[in-house]
Every structure is written in C-alpha cells, then in structure tokens.
Regions:
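Terminal recognition/anchoring or ligand-binding modules at protein termini
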Residues: 504-561, 565-652
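Bacterial N-terminal signal peptides
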Residues: 6-17
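Charged, amphipathic alpha-helical linkers/stalks
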Residues: 486-489, 496-508
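N-terminal Rossmann-fold NAD(P) dinucleotide-binding loop
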Residues: 40
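Beta1/beta-strand and adjacent pyrophosphate-binding region of the FAD-binding site
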Residues: 25-37
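Boundary at the C-terminal end of the N-terminal hydrophobic targeting segment
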Residues: 19-24
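Flavin (FAD/FMN)-binding glycine-rich loop and adjacent Rossmann-like elements that form
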Residues: 137, 155-168, 172-475
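Conserved N-terminal/central alpha/beta ligand/cofactor-binding core
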Residues: 46, 52-53, 58-142, 146, ...
Length: 652
C-alpha cells in the first residue's frame, strides 16, 4: 500500500493571538485551562498548536499532575496504542533514558520514569508553544460568564488576584472543582444499576469513591535510613502487604507477593522506587470531592502520615532499612509529592454518559457513541477499595475484563453550561467505567481532545457544542491520535488512517477480545470480507441495503435497478466479497451519491490499489478488510461527508 488518503485541517489563523494584558490585572486569552495536570498540559499544547492563545492556571509549580506532581511515574496501559501527545511523551522518555526498553524497570508498567523527568518533559513541551502563558503557583477562585466571555479570577503567588477573560474554559482540575463552580450537575460515587444499566453496578447508589494514594518515591542510600517510629504506627495495618511472618489473615489471599516483588513493582530508572502499593499498603480512603479546603488539607495530612507509617513498616519490619524518601526528587519540605494520587473525581452529567456497556458492546447500544471517539484505552476496570471500612457491599471490580475501548466526545461536554469543556477524570462516565478511563494515557488524550475542541470553537466562533465531531476527530487523527482502539493496525501502518476513519463510521466493525491482561479490539485488516461484515454500509447509505441482499432472487444492482456487473451477487460469492463485488458496490454508491461516475470511480480505485500496494486485477479474489477500507475511504469519503452528532447518529 502507499501513503494515506486524508485531508489535513489547518487551523492556524491571524484571528488567534497570544494571551495579552488588557488593563491592570486583566488579561485576555482565547482559552483558559484550569489545571496543568495530565489532561491540562496536553489540552494546552494541542490548543496552541492549532493557533489559540492559552492561559494555564496550575496550583503547583509542576506540570503533569498524577504522572508527576502525584508521583505516579508508571503509565498504565496503551503501550501498543501510543496515541497523540501520549505517544510524544513516551518517545521523549525513551530519548531521555536511551530507549523504550530502558523504561521497563518495574513490573507494574512498561513505561516507568522519575516524576521529575516527566515534569521537565512537560515543561519543555509547553515552552515550545508560544501561545501558552503558564501561571504556576496559582489557583482559580471564581468564574463568571456574561454570555460571551468567561471571567476567571485567579489568586497569584504574589497575593494579587488577576482576571483572565476568555472565550472557552477547560476544567482540567484533579477533582472537577471548576465544573462545580459553573453549576454543572455531577455524580460522586457509584450509580445504581437503574441509572447505568450495568450488570455489575450496585443495586443502590452510594457516595463511595476509590481509595487515593499518597505516593512515596524512595531511593537506596546504601546505609541504615530507618526513620523514627511515626505517631499512630500499628504494624497490623500493613501486615499483609506481602508474604511475611506477620500476615495471618490477608484481605486478598490471592494477591500476596514476596516482599522483593512488592518493592520492584514500582522500580524506576535511576534506582528509585515508586511506593504506590494497593495490597494493604499505602492506599487511603478519603472522599475529598466536596470537602472544604480545610478539610482537604486535613485529609492530605492523614494520607501522608499513613504513607510514612507504611515506609516505616517496610524499613523496620521487612528489612528495607536502606530505602528512604529520595532527596533529589521533590522540592518539598517533606520530600513527598505535591499532591495525592486521586483515582476518582466528581463526574459531570454530560451530553452523553459513557458506561461499561459501551466498553464491552459498543455496537449493540442505543447510542452508537463509538462513532464519536476521541480517545482510546486498553486497561481493565481497576477499582481500589480495600481501605474503605463501611458496611456497604461493593462489587468486585479488581481488573474486571473489558476489550480495548474508545471514549466519546460528548463525555467532555456538560449538558447545559456553554463554552465549558471538562477533562481529567471529571468527564461524563459511570463510576465503573472510570476504573478504566481514569488511567494516564486516556486522560492525556482527553486533554488533547479538549484542547482541539476549544481551539476549533474559537477559530470558527462557535459554541463548543456546535463544533463538528468529525472535525475534532480529524484534527486528532492528523496529530497522531487514535479514534478506534485497534490493536492490529498500528499507527505506522500504511492503512492506519483509512481503517480508523472507516471504523469510526461503523461500515466495518472491530471485534473486542479480553484475554488475561491483553485487552484488544481487532480490525482484522487481512481477513476476507464476509457479506455480514458490511451490514453497516446500509446505516451510512440506506439505499445500499438492496445492494447487500444476496439471495437467489436478488442481484447486485445499482439504485436504478440495473445489474452492476452483469452477475448476481450469489454468482460471485455467497460468503465473502470478491474484488469484483467490492469495486461494483463502491462504484454504485459513488454514482448514487453523485460523487463521480462509475468509470471515474473505477479509475480512482485502480489508483488507490497501486498507491496502497494491492492488486484488483483478479476480480474473483476475495477482498481483504483493509483493502475495502481503503477503497471506501478513498472514493466515498464517508467519514468526512457523513457527519454525526454527539450521540453518534448520522446527521441527515
């Protein structure tokens, strides 16, 4: 095959400018992003690359959020789907450490890194974008909207309050605090089965969130570094964190590991160790979502103390007395990260709600949300609840299997509030689905999509809910992103983009599989095309239904009732399409859609076959799925020409 057939949307325009100071204490920008975390930084970079001016407001001095400021230097999932800016970040890590193999130091992830290195990479990415103004050590205190512009009031490190006026506001905060300020309805905790229709959801809703973790980054000093016994220390709190003599009744007997495996779980390059241990380790329960600032500070204090008691247990009881908090990782007084690792936030009521059912059976739902995907993931549903001590019966959500999945654009859009895009872990997903969508590569893609959506809205002077789904998707695809979570069509494949685009129309559908930790969706580009494989063609082109019937009485016909190639479909192939069938079908649809005459379509398909390196001379040969995707994409352009709304339905 040859190069991909695609069109690149260029959004750079003179109407978009850098953020600037209008009057004393008032700045103007196209976009304000609250939060410079995992999604905030990618939103800023993507928006700036599309020509928008951006102000990023971040409470800490670091960029990257859970990946850096919270200490989770271990990327979960998407190793084989390096989508967009997540792929750029991974490549930058590999360049820093020497290779992708050099990142495989711990067994929890194939991408391990020191948080400080990740922070520098994110700062470098932002520094390259001249349209980004970065305000660190700053916090959004209030927001208002006058019908045209947002006024975002920001407390600065010097004690002053500055205001940024912007057309679009992006909430990339850790707990969705801006969405709450804006009056967006939201959920906290687990929804009931009646709400989400998920079989494994609880019968009754509750407000239980996942455990958070205050991560510790340790290093080996080569000498005894045992700390003083912390206040409130009780060895029984951690006795069953691993296999050891103190463990009598483990909460999770099937998840017991030797102590050395516990430590190497999060081994980082540079000889450091991430302590983010979920099995009776330093997970900590605190529902901080709706707490006051004072209550949050107290919860953070308790979470830190819990982690330090666990570090002492490791030193004193397990013999790891040469390990202690790294003195060259965080510039904090206590050497701990800037913030806890939040696994769950408030989740907005969005234009759509993404659930476990959309993950497991994307093609069987009332809303075909897969057509609107803007991010992909392949991590199982992973919930942490071992430190919760309430009486409620919680569903067993330890790595519930799912295939790889895509996240819809409508999950970033609140139902009512205009010109607000919500990112990070506050998107409109169910509590159960959040167990997969919360992981770092997905959240980075969410941010990139938020930035693209915001920038396009500014450029086109539209509401964020008026922007074409396909336009956002095309920008992401051209930026190296994935729309469909195909494991067998890698990004460097020559037919990657055609397969992505055709997959997003539903004309050819993927097949989800989950085997152990291998969660995949397969496009099967080299498989022959069965007739039922292209039932989706009639969803895009309703008149094509008659072309897909192949019983004894119905021939392959064009819409004027004429035989396309002089033979009935059955005469050519009952079970699978031949090359001749495919050419005839595509040519007939092109004619009906008034795209081109049959002869012109045949010429285009001959050119595409040459370009993409496959042969169409043997009309009896069974055509492959990847080949058919190229022909449909290159002649009919259904992705570009058949627009969809945020629910995935075609706009007729």
């Amino acid at each position: 095959m040859g190069k991909t057939f695609s069109c690149i949307i260029i959004l750079l325009a003179s109407s978009l400018c850098f953020a600037h100071k209008a009057t004393a204490g008032i700045f103007r920008s196209d976009i304000v992003i609250a939060g410079g975390g995992t999604s905030g930084v990618t939103a800023a970079v993507q928006a700036a690359r599309l020509g928008a001016s951006v102000v990023v407001v971040e409470q800490t001095t670091w960029l990257g959020g859970m990946l850096t400021a919270a200490g989770v230097g271990a990327v979960d999932g998407n190793y084989n789907m390096p989508a967009g800016l997540w792929g750029e970040f991974r490549d930058s890590l590999a360049a820093h450490y020497g290779s992708l193999e050099a990142l495989k130091t711990g067994w929890v992830s194939n991408v391990m890194f020191e948080p400080s290195v990740g922070n520098r990479i994110f700062h470098n990415m932002v520094a390259k974008e001249k349209g980004v103004m970065l305000w660190t050590g700053s916090e959004v205190k209030a927001v208002s909207h006058n019908g045209n512009m947002w006024a975002v009031h920001v407390a600065r490190p010097d004690g002053q309050t500055d205001t940024v006026e912007a057309k679009v506001l992006v909430d990339a905060t850790e707990l969705g605090d801006i969405a709450k300020m804006c009056g967006v309805p939201y959920d906290v905790g687990m929804e009931s089965q009646a709400v989400t229709h998920e079989d494994i959801a609880p019968a009754q809703a509750n407000n239980i969130v996942q455990d958070l973790t205050y991560v510790a980054i340790l290093k080996d000093y080569g000498r005894d570094m045992t700390m003083e016994k912390p206040e409130g220390y009780n060895a029984n709190d951690f006795a069953c964190c691993c296999i050891n003599d103190k463990c009598i009744t483990p909460k999770e007997p099937n998840r017991q590991w030797p102590k050395d495996k516990m430590v190497t779980y999060g081994k980082m390059p540079g000889g450091k160790y991430m302590i983010n241990w979920p099995i009776e380790g330093n997970d900590f329960y605190a529902n901080m979502v709706d707490m006051t600032p004072e209550q949050r500070n107290e919860a953070v204090r308790k979470a830190k103390a819990h982690t330090m008691r666990f570090v002492y247990f490791m030193q004193h009881e397990l013999g790891f007395n040469t390990l202690a908090l790294a003195d060259d990782e965080y510039p904090t007084a206590d050497r701990l990260p800037f913030m806890p690792y939040h696994r769950e936030s408030r989740r907005i009521h969005g234009k759509v709600r993404f659930t476990l059912n959309h993950m497991t059976d994307p093609y069987e739902q009332a809303q075909p949300l897969y057509r609107t995907n803007i991010a992909v993931g392949d991590y199982p549903v992973d919930h942490h609840h071992t430190r919760y001590t309430g009486e409620e019966q919680l569903p067993d959500l330890h790595f519930h299997p799912v295939p790889s999945f895509g996240l819809p654009l409508g999950s970033l859009l609140p139902q009512e509030v205009k010109q607000l895009v919500v990112a990070e872990k506050s998107v409109s997903v169910s509590n159960i689905a959040n167990g997969s969508t919360r992981l770092q590569p997905v959240v980075m893609q969410i941010g990139q999509a938020a930035g693209a959506l915001a920038a396009i809205a500014v450029k086109q002077n539209k509401g964020v809910d008026e922007v074409s789904v396909r336009e956002v998707q095309n920008v992401l695809l051209e930026a190296g992103g994935y729309l469909m979570p195909y494991a067998d069509v890698p990004k460097d494949s020559i037919c990657f983009k055609p397969c992505q685009r055709i997959g997003a129309t539903g004309i050819l559908k993927g097949k989800g599989v989950s085997i152990d930790w291998h969660n995949k969706t397969l496009f099967r580009p080299d498989a022959v095309v069965a007739w039922n494989d292209i039932a989706g063609l009639a969803e895009v082109y309703p008149f094509a239904a008659k072309l897909l019937r192949h019983d004894e009485e119905v021939s392959s016909v064009d819409t004027n009732g004429q035989s396309v190639d002089g033979q009935s479909v059955d005469a050519l192939s009952v079970d699978a399409l031949s090359v001749g069938d495919a050419l005839s079908l595509v040519a007939a649809i092109a004619k009906q859609e008034k795209l081109m005459k049959r002869s012109a379509a045949m010429k285009v398909m001959a050119s595409l076959a040459k370009e993409y390196d496959f042969c169409i001379d043997d009309r009896q040969r069974k055509i492959k799925r990847g080949e058919l995707a190229v022909l449909i994409d290159g002649v009919l352009h259904p992705f570009e020409k058949k627009q969809v709304d945020v629910e995935g339905r075609f706009v007729r």
